[in-house]
Amino acid sequence: MFRGARRADLDAILKIYVRARQAMADSGNPTQWGDHFPPQELLEEDIDSNRLFLYLVNGELEGVFAFILGPDPTYARIEDGKWLNDTLPYGTIHRLASAGRHPGAVITWCLEHCESLRADTHADNKIMQHLLEKNGFTKCGIIHVEDGTPRIAYQKMSLTLPLRRD
C-alpha cells in the first residue's frame, strides 16, 4: 500500500534512511548521502508539499521516496546524452530508501501516475543503478545537482502510453 507521509511518520522515516545510508556505505557509496542526508527539514518540507510517500507492506514501512510531478530544475541541462523524451510532462523519484524486500514496487507505482519517469543517482550508487536498469530505465546522460556534483540521469517511459498521432 502506498500513501502520503505524515509528520507523525518521521521517526520511522528517519530510521529507514539511517539503514539506507549504512547500506550505501557498506556497498562502497559512503559519500552520496553522508551521515545526515536527507535532513529532517527537507523531509518535513516534502511532507508539507505532499510529495513524500511511504510504501507499506502488512503495515510495516518498506520504503520512502519523494515523487515529484513537473519540471525538475536540475534536469534542465543534461550532458553526454539526451532525455528519451523532452516534451512530455514527467515525474521524478528522489530520496528513495527501502528495506529492499520488494524491489521495483516504487517504480511501478510511480509509472502508474505519470507517462515519463526520471531519476538520478551517484556514480558510486551501484545498487540504485542496478535497480533502475533492471526495471527498464535508460541511462540518458549526466546532470548536476544543486551543489554541482554530477549524477547519472535515467528515464523510463510508461508502457501504457496511449498512441499519439500528432
Predicted regions and their residues:
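Conserved beta-strand-loop-alpha-helix junction that forms the acyl-donor binding cleft
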Residues: S98, A119-H130, D147
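A short beta-loop-alpha structural element at the N-terminal edge
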Residues: M1-K15
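Conserved acyl-donor/pantetheine-binding loop and adjacent beta-alpha core of acyl/acetyltransferases
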Residues: A66-R101
